[in-house]
């Protein structure tokens, strides 16, 4: 009974995800609009194709098809069409991924660089996929590293950056992101991720830190590098147990 209930709930969710995406006949693609993006400076009603959400849609719909096959059902052809035609991440003339397809001033307007750099979550929290060019994502990471308004970030932004750097083969940045000396990257003796006097407990930071460390140690499916999130400079003796690779 439990398995049937879980399967039913997942089916409802996956059908919603398919129905939520809009087919753009002119562009022969599916787009995401009207969602509340992780980057909170974006307007939900007007935002088109935020990158983290696009990548998550691609990943989640693939998992939905795998679950159908495990349940003995055929793949949903409409879902496969969505997976095949989902919009790639939008970028500018400098090869930098935008905060959203219609956020053309991402790297000029300080509002866009004073919040979660959610674009990094598209590869890091999630695996690399066909919507993303690795060279453009590396460009984006470097620009964010050098220019972001880090004083306006939140606790989970640092582990998200570390996971992105790990998957892009930048272990030095992964470690430095977790150790960055910023107020919102502070952990108190009791373990809480301090943000400010108003917000002394911030669990997304704790969860992000644990997830980032696990990825940096155990890697991900198909990763052949030992401890991929730590520099190979002879200064690290990494020991861990009981962790599984991420997707």
Model region roles, listed by residue range:
Residues 8, 51-222:
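Active-site core of glycosidic bond-cleaving carbohydrate-active enzymes
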Residues 2, 24, 153, 221-228:
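Short, surface-exposed helix-loop/turn micro-motifs enriched in polar/charged residues
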Residues 227-247:
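Surface beta-strand/loop "capping" patches
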Residues 1-14:
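Single conserved hydrophobic/aromatic residue that forms the stacking wall/gate
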């Amino acid at each position: 009974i439990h398995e049937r209930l879980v399967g039913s709930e997942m089916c409802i969710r996956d059908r919603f995800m398919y129905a939520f995406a809009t087919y753009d006949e002119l562009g022969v693609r599916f787009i995401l609009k009207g969602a509340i993006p992780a980057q909170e400076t974006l307007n939900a009603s007007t935002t088109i194709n935020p990158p983290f959400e696009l990548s998550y849609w691609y990943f989640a719909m693939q998992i939905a098809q795998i679950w159908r096959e495990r349940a003995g059902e055929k793949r949903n052809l409409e879902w496969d069409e969505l997976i095949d035609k989902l919009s790639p991440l939008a970028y500018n003339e400098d090869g930098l991924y935008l905060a959203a397809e219609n956020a053309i001033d991402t790297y000029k307007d300080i509002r866009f660089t004073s919040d979660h750099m959610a674009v990094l979550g598209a590869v890091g929290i999630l695996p690399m996929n066909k919507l993303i060019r690795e060279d453009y994502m590396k460009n984006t990471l470097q620009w964010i590293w050098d220019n972001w308004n880090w004083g306006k970030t939140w606790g989970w932004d640092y582990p998200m950056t570390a996971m992105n750097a790990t998957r892009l083969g930048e272990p030095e940045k992964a470690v430095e992101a977790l150790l960055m000396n910023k107020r919102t990257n502070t952990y108190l003796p009791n373990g809480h991720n301090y943000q400010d006097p108003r917000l002394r407990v911030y669990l997304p930071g704790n969860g992000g830190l644990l997830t980032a460390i696990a990825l940096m140690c155990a890697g991900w499916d198909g990763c052949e590098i030992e401890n991929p999130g730590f520099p190979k400079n002879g200064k690290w003796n990494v020991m861990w147990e009981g962790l599984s690779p991420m997707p």
